[in-house]
């Protein structure tokens, strides 16, 4: 694996000079191998190691290089046709392969090659970009989007119209991460490498970026870029220091543990916030 990484790192340093016409065989094969490993889930752009999320920047570099080495081509999408550098993940799937991999895809859901979809996942008409990782038992609901390199945990529900931000550039930026057993409400947006920790519930229409204040009403603490595990979060506002205006924030209205979450429905958690 180190040799593969070295090829990618070296090629990335001279990426401005690489074109589909002049790319060398070693670089092309290395990039294609990485995309294949991302596609199968054998590699992932970010993973939790010793309780901390670690981003493998060289894998992001490989994804970016894939755009340099490939020309646009006509892609058959069943109901439509596309013209892009990245093939569709399911272009050569037959019924046997869908059965083997064990997920369900509802038309016209679109998944780019280099994204991993785990077993027991349901993709309603949605979009999953290259480098993303969608783990077991997750529902990606209608018109939800999973951005490039985003990491979606087990048993997550991304409701209708949810946007999970992608991150290929700037290179140092970390991907957006939704940990296991989270619920993201309709039309919410989680972007810019924000981490929603395990078991959290995000209400409808909540917008979370790195500059968004995430206010815990029980403690008065303000978080940035991270929703603590087990949080129930709704949209809100915080007053300015001079009291003349207020600015948008997200409010943690309560904390729930796995036992409580298992006994109480999502709707009840969101409706009983007083």
UniProtKB/Swiss-Prot annotation:
Entry's EC annotation: 2.3.1.117
InterPro entries linked: DapD_Trfase_Hexpep_rpt_fam, Hexapep, Hexapep_transf_CS, THP_succinylTrfase_dom1, THP_succinylTrfase_N_sf, Trimer_LpxA-like_sf
Biological or metabolic pathway of the protein: Amino-acid biosynthesis; L-lysine biosynthesis via DAP pathway; LL-2,6-diaminopimelate from (S)-tetrahydrodipicolinate (succinylase route): step 1/3
EC primary class: transferase
One function term, GO molecular function aspect: nucleotidyltransferase activity
Major subcellular site: cytoplasm
Protein's gene: dapD
Gene3D superfamilies for this protein: Hexapeptide repeat proteins (2.160.10.10), Tetrahydrodipicolinate-N-succinyltransferase, N-terminal domain (1.10.166.10)
Reactions mediated catalytically: (S)-2,3,4,5-tetrahydrodipicolinate + succinyl-CoA + H2O = (S)-2-succinylamino-6-oxoheptanedioate + CoA
Domain of life per record: Bacteria
Coiled coil: none
Keyword entries, A-Z: Acyltransferase, Amino-acid biosynthesis, Cytoplasm, Diaminopimelate biosynthesis, Lysine biosynthesis, Repeat, Transferase
GO cellular component terms attached to this protein's record: cytoplasm
Protein name: 2,3,4,5-tetrahydropyridine-2,6-dicarboxylate N-succinyltransferase
Cellular localisation: Cytoplasm
Protein family: Belongs to the transferase hexapeptide repeat family.
The keyword Transferase is annotated on this UniProt entry: yes
Any one biological process term the GO annotation gives: lysine biosynthetic process via diaminopimelate
Database matches in SUPFAM superfamilies: Trimeric LpxA-like enzymes
């Amino acid at each position: 694996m180190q040799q593969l990484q070295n090829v990618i790192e070296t090629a990335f340093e001279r990426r401005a000079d690489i074109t589909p016409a002049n790319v060398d065989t070693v670089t092309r094969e290395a990039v294609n191998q990485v995309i294949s490993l991302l596609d199968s889930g054998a590699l992932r752009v970010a993973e939790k190691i010793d309780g901390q999320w670690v981003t493998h920047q060289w894998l992001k570099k490989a994804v970016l290089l894939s755009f340099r080495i490939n020309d646009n081509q006509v892609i058959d999408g069943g109901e439509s046709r596309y013209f892009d550098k990245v093939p569709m993940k399911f272009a050569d799937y037959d019924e046997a392969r869908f059965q083997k991999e064990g997920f369900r895809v509802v038309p016209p859901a679109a998944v780019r090659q280099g994204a991993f979809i785990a077993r027991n996942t349901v993709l309603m008409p949605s979009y999953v970009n290259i480098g993303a990782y969608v783990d077991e038992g997750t529902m990606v609901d209608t018109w939800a989007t999973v951005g490039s390199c985003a990491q979606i945990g087990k048993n997550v529900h991304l409701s209708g119209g949810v946007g999970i931000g992608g991150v290929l550039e700037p290179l140092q930026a970390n991907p957006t991460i939704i940990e296991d057993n989270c619920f993201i409400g309709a039309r919410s947006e989680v972007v810019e490498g924000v981490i929603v920790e395990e078991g959290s519930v995000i209400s409808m229409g909540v917008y979370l970026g790195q500059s968004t204040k995430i206010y815990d009403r029980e403690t008065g603490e303000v978080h940035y870029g991270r929703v603590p595990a087990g949080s129930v979060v709704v949209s809100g506002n915080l007053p300015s220091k001079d009291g003349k205006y207020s600015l948008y924030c997200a409010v943690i209205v309560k904390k729930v543990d796995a036992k409580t979450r298992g006994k109480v429905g999502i709707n009840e958690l969101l409706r009983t916030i007083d």
